[in-house]
Amino acid sequence: MLRLPTVLRQMRPVSRALAPHLTRAYAKDVKFGADARALMLQGVDLLADAVAVTMGPKGRTVIIEQSWGSPKVTKDGVTVAKSIDLKDKYKNIGAKLVQDVANNTNEEAGDGTTTATVLARSIAKEGFEKISKGANPVEIRRGVMLAVDAVIAELKKQSKPVTTPEEIAQVATISANGDKDIGNIISDAMKKVGRKGVITVKDGKTLNDELEIIEGMKFDRGYISPYFINTSKGQKCEFQDAYVLLSEKKISSVQSIVPALEIANAHRKPLVIIAEDVDGEALSTLVLNRLKVGLQVVAVKAPGFGDNRKNQLKDMAIATGGAVFGEEGLNLNLEDVQAHDLGKVGEVIVTKDDAMLLKGKGDKAHIEKRIQEITEQLDITTSEYEKEKLNERLAKLSDGVAVLKVGGTSDVEVNEKKDRVTDALNATRAAVEEGIVLGGGCALLRCIPALDSLKPANEDQKIGIEIIKRALKIPAMTIAKNAGVEGSLIVEKILQSSSEVGYDAMLGDFVNMVEKGIIDPTKVVRTALLDAAGVASLLTTAEAVVTEIPKEEKDPGMGAMGGMGGGMGGGMF
């Protein structure tokens, strides 16, 4: 029997032989205090500098290399922020934290990402400087948040509700970098579908921007067979006052659809069949009857896949007042169909590529309840794909959908413009929600006097308040700097002027901001400050930073190649 010491002695040579191969992957590197903060600040500076150049009406664009396709040209702050990834791990941590500020602001308000980024840089930079001189970072953070609360309260006092289409157009124009055409098209869209209506942005097919209003439920599935066409003009099938049969399952047998056809025939109504598929003898019988006796029917494949298809069919059932056959939990068979199981619509248009159900006769209360359910799902989902699909479903159930088709001469131009249109649309929605304040960074400047009355608990909190006082000047200074003038002089002149006067960077003049329509949504300014202060003041409290040391790849060397050559040589003869 072997004793334990003997076993261990025998294992030693083995462990020595294996030692070079048993290396730890992903070891960590730790930096403390001023060293760590200095490196993070360099990352913050790099990201903020790249984003800041896009600010204001005379801001420049940024060109971003992409892993595929042509480079992206943009003036959208959050797009620039997201594209930055630094090689140095410590610098990258600083950059990523400010990137989070831009992302949060974009998700909550849809605009104001550049403002949030320059504010975050200012707060972090000043905070680091004060801490290096011995101030307490925790108390500085308390002072910063105290000042931010006071500024937000003051912003709410300054805020005015958006009432007219002209004001909506002004907000959209400012956010679209002074493009009045974009401002007007968004204002028109809101006029047509209502302020809470659904507005989507898509690539256009022409050189000009277009606005299309879609009423009812439109989905991208056309007729299954061209024999269903009933108009000579436009290769489409059109019905007035029709019944709708909805099925989750494939329809192949004729017997299953005869009862529905008999009901439609008895009521002298056309029938629209929307199912997973219609094929076999069911399809051939429908086509034959359509051609021989002029049967008023059209078959369409249900849109989407999996759960998305089920949800869309359920939406159609609610919008038209019908039921979905084959739905889990409901023992509804197509053979037992009754008139009340069929949906009812005022008008149906089916083309080769899409179908539209207009003037659905569904119960308004049920539709409202369904809209509420989808809105609640939207609030909790984090997936961008899910959000897109939920928004599409919401749009179809709402009164109408406005589609902004962005035109241009090339993909690069369309994509750049699309970024601005999306920003403008988000800013407009934010303005309708919480009102408007002076634009051009003036609203934040007008909040500075409100900080004078604050009573900090100690000297370090007072430093935090002073940090915010200086940060509030940064957006206006950045806009002026991008317009080629001295920012600090512009800011001082604005502070000495009456409350509605600000700097119009486009004209290079001091004007009444409200009369000129240079306004920002309150929600955008508030969110930008809150997110920037929260993350930047947390950044200043960091005393240690832990990063992963990249795994070193061993150089295989050239020895293997030589051996391989010899082996091959030996094998050849």
UniProtKB/Swiss-Prot annotation:
Question: Could you tell me which Pfam families the record lists for this protein?
Answer: Cpn60_TCP1
- Where on the chain is N6-acetyllysine found, per UniProt? 75, 82, 87, 91, 125, 130, 133, 156, 191, 202, 205, 218, 236, 249-250, 269, 292, 314, 352, 359, 389, 396, 455, 469, 481
Q: Which residues are recorded as binding ATP? A: 75, 111-115, 440, 520
EC assignment: the record states: 5.6.1.7
Question: Primary place of residence?
Answer: mitochondrion
One GO MF term: ATP binding
List residues modified as N6-malonyllysine. 133
Complex and partners: Homoheptamer arranged in a ring structure. The functional units of these chaperonins consist of heptameric rings of the large subunit Hsp60, which function as a back-to-back double ring. Interacts with 2 heptameric Hsp10 rings to form the symmetrical football complex. Interacts with HRAS. Interacts with ATAD3A. Interacts with ETFBKMT and EEF1AKMT3. Interacts with MFHAS1.
Name the family: Belongs to the chaperonin (HSP60) family.
The record, for HAMAP family, names: CH60
**Entry function:** Chaperonin implicated in mitochondrial protein import and macromolecular assembly. Together with Hsp10, facilitates the correct folding of imported proteins. May also prevent misfolding and promote the refolding and proper assembly of unfolded polypeptides generated under stress conditions in the mitochondrial matrix. The functional units of these chaperonins consist of heptameric rings of the large subunit Hsp60, which function as a back-to-back double ring.
Name of the protein in question: 60 kDa heat shock protein, mitochondrial
Origin organism is Rattus norvegicus
